[in-house]
Amino acid sequence: MIRKQEITTFEFPEKAVIWDVRDSSAYAEGHVKGAVSRPINDLNADILNQVAADQPIYILCGGGSKAPRAAEKLEGLDASREYVVLMGGTRAARDAGLPLEQGA
């Protein structure tokens, strides 16, 4: 199941699995605190299986175009999971003053 949530109004659960699907250089320039780099082209069943099946996966990108595509790709691998697309991406998070981190 894919659902959408505005990143600016979203409250991250304490142990959230947050995947930033931009390329690694864009991720290193700045990403939402707690997000891990999972470039869209690298998403596969092996990576997906590293996350507990009942754990929602929160997906974001730079501005909101790659994350929905990544969610569709993941849903194609396992439709029983919950995928949450964080709309607006890193750009909206930065503009809203949410904490960002730099580096890999």
Locations of regions flagged by a protein language model:
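Short, surface-exposed ligand- or partner-binding patches at beta-edge/loop junctions that are enriched
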Residues: 60-61
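Rhodanese-like catalytic fold shared by cysteine-dependent sulfurtransferases
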Residues: 1-17, 21-56, 65-104
